[in-house]
Amino acid sequence: MEDKTVELQFITHFTDTYSYYDSARMALEGGCRWIQLRMKDTPVDEVEREAIRLQGLCKDYGATFVIDDHVELVKKIHADGVHLGKKDMPVAEARGILGKEFIIGGTANTFDDVKMHYKAGADYIGCGPFRFTTTKKDLSPVLGLEGYRSIILQMKEANIHLPIVAIGGITLEDIPSIMETGITGIALSGTILRAKDPVAETKRIMNL
């Protein structure tokens, strides 16, 4: 990584302590410049209200704003892009709706997933989980460092060049060894929000 700076994606999470908006604001204050709004099992009108607020906040910080799952909402409010989970709309279908101007990320757990998203026109891959995480239901098999090394190696052999972002149960201490596998960046949520000072924790991560 240039300047040894971690490319950090922050995924919003509603907790007893922080709202979606507060969680994003703290990550932005700490230097993160990529926010994904993730509101599973929430009516789309509520997601839209939160998305519009967060979109304005991200613009203030010059940050990329991506919404999980809601392709039509991304197009409606002109967010920067969408992240699609394994049970969400296929990447190719989303690309057909959004065209080339929007960012589309796909979720992968295997090299075959990566290859499928690459052929479908994904801009980046969220790859995981690194380990068990309590912030997500229906986890795919845990990858660990060896899983990432294997996927990165197979990508090189197949001449597939696509940013790969590690996700799932990652702690600050894990990040250096994960980055050494050839991973492009890290996606975090609970690790930051469980810290005593989420802003300071984000700064520490950004400066690893």
UniProtKB/Swiss-Prot annotation:
> Which pathway does it operate in?
Cofactor biosynthesis; thiamine diphosphate biosynthesis; thiamine phosphate from 4-amino-2-methyl-5-diphosphomethylpyrimidine and 4-methyl-5-(2-phosphoethyl)-thiazole: step 1/1
> What Pfam families does the database record attribute to this sequence?
TMP-TENI
> What is written in the cofactor note of this entry?
Binds 1 Mg(2+) ion per subunit.
Identify the cofactor(s).
Mg(2+)
Give each disulfide bond as a residue pair. Answer: none
Q: Which InterPro entries match?
A: Aldolase_TIM, ThiamineP_synth_sf, ThiamineP_synth_TenI, TMP_synthase
Tagged with keyword Transmembrane helix: no
What reaction gets catalysed by this protein? 2-[(2R,5Z)-2-carboxy-4-methylthiazol-5(2H)-ylidene]ethyl phosphate + 4-amino-2-methyl-5-(diphosphooxymethyl)pyrimidine + 2 H(+) = thiamine phosphate + CO2 + diphosphate; 2-(2-carboxy-4-methylthiazol-5-yl)ethyl phosphate + 4-amino-2-methyl-5-(diphosphooxymethyl)pyrimidine + 2 H(+) = thiamine phosphate + CO2 + diphosphate; 4-methyl-5-(2-phosphooxyethyl)-thiazole + 4-amino-2-methyl-5-(diphosphooxymethyl)pyrimidine + H(+) = thiamine phosphate + diphosphate
Name the positions where 4-amino-2-methyl-5-(diphosphooxymethyl)pyrimidine binds: Q36, L37, R38, M39, K40, D68, T107, K136
Residue sites binding 2-[(2R,5Z)-2-carboxy-4-methylthiazol-5(2H)-ylidene]ethyl phosphate per the record: T133, T134, T135, G169
Q: Which GO terms describe its cellular component?
A: cytoplasm
Instruction: Look up the EC number in the record and give it.
Output: 2.5.1.3
Q: Which GO terms describe its biological process?
A: thiamine biosynthetic process; thiamine diphosphate biosynthetic process
Binding site residues for Mg(2+): D69, D88
- Work out whether the entry's keyword set contains DNA-binding: no
Q: What does this protein do?
A: Condenses 4-methyl-5-(beta-hydroxyethyl)thiazole monophosphate (THZ-P) and 2-methyl-4-amino-5-hydroxymethyl pyrimidine pyrophosphate (HMP-PP) to form thiamine monophosphate (TMP).
Query: What is the protein's name according to its record?
Result: Thiamine-phosphate synthase
The organism's lineage is: Bacteria, Pseudomonadati, Bacteroidota, Bacteroidia, Bacteroidales
